[in-house]
Amino acid sequence: MDLNDTASVKAAVEALSDTTLAGVVNNAGIMCRHYTLSSDGYETTLNVNYYNTMRFNNALLQQVTQGGALVFTTSITRIFVPRHINADSVNRHTFGQLKTYALSKKLITGYALELARKAESRGIRVNCCDPGIVNSGMITMHRWYDSLADIFFRPFIRAAYKGAVPAIRALLSPLSGRIFTLRNIHKH
């Protein structure tokens, strides 16, 4: 499924239409360096990390069994987004790589909190996981200082398997409406 293509998201939902789901972990995400628009006219980072992730889960919610769980990947960067910034404020002139990524994570976290309230009556748990800074291609900023960051910073970041731990904890926990990190559980 291509989360930057709404038709692809709809096709994935259709392919899963006869499937009962015990859990869904939403772990796809991007951080675009430049401002680009999807074929639907949405900024690409917001489209993948928020809009189509939300559309996918809204469409699949009826297929999640009682006692099932939905998990959304968030980021600590979300706390640095000012309250007055929203998806409508992102355009060619206001776009920033990290700023837009952080906004997408703030939005998906807010969506997850609201969904946790709505899904509670059906016995469906909804949580977020924050993997921390994981050694992956996502942290490459495609800037002149990447080689320096690789030398001084990469040795201190988490291996990918440790980044998966919060998602597993969030999926298996009896709690709902929480953010799971490697060591802690936070209320939204």
At which residue positions do the language-model features occur?
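Conserved Rossmann-fold cofactor-binding substructure of NAD(P)-dependent oxidoreductases
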Residues: 2-20
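Active-site Tyr-X3-Lys motif and surrounding loop/helix of classical short-chain dehydrogenase/reductase
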Residues: 11, 40-47
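Conserved hydrophobic beta-strands of the Rossmann-like cofactor-binding core
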Residues: 21-25
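Catalytic loop of short-chain dehydrogenase/reductase
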Residues: 30-37, 43, 69-121, 130-143
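Ankyrin-repeat alpha-helix packing hotspot
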Residues: 50-51
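A short, exposed helix-loop element centered on a Lys and neighboring polar residues
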Residues: 57-58, 113
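Conserved helix-to-beta-strand junction in the class I
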Residues: 63
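C-terminal helical subdomain
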Residues: 128, 150-188
